[in-house]
Amino acid sequence: MIERAFQKEVADVLGLSDHECSPITLDQERPLYATAFGFYESGDYRSAAQLFAQLVLTDPYSVHYWSGLASSKQMAQDYLAAVHAWGIVSLLKENDPISHFHAAECFLSLDEKEDALKALNAALELAGKNEMLLEKINLLKTIHYAKF
C-alpha cells in the first residue's frame, strides 16, 4: 500500500474526490478490476473511472489500472484528467504509441492543438509498422492540421 500523502497528491492531479481515493486491500484488487472493467464495457465510464482510480492508488505502477483510468476519463469526456492518466501510461510503457495517440485525442478535444500535434508526432515515431494506428494518426493530422 502506498503512503496516504502520495495518494492525496495523485488524487489532486487527477481531480478525484475523497470518496474516489479511499484505499482498498490487496485481496479486493482483482474483483474491483473486474467490476471496473464491467462498468467500462457497459458504458458507465464515471463508475469505471472511480474504481480504476482506487486501483491506481493501490498499485500506482500498474499500466492496466492507469490505462483503465485514462480510457474511462476520456470516454466520460474528462479530457484533462485523461491526459494526465495517459501521461502516466506513457511513462510506464514508454515504447507504446497508443497512450500518445489517445492523449492527442484528448488535447484536440480541449482545443490544445500544439500539444496534440506533439503527442501525435510521438505516437507516429513509436508506431513502427502498425498500419491501422498510422492511418489514424495521419487522419487526425490531415483533419486538424492540413493547410487548405
Model regions and ranges:
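Long, contiguous interaction/recruitment modules in multidomain scaffold/adaptor proteins
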Residues: 1-28
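TPR/TPR-like (Sel1-like) alpha-helical repeat modules
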Residues: 108-131, 138-142
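Register position in tetratricopeptide repeats
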Residues: 41, 75, 109, 142-147
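Alpha-helical adaptor scaffolds
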Residues: 26-98
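Ankyrin-repeat and related helical/solenoid repeat scaffolds used for protein-protein interactions
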Residues: 87-118
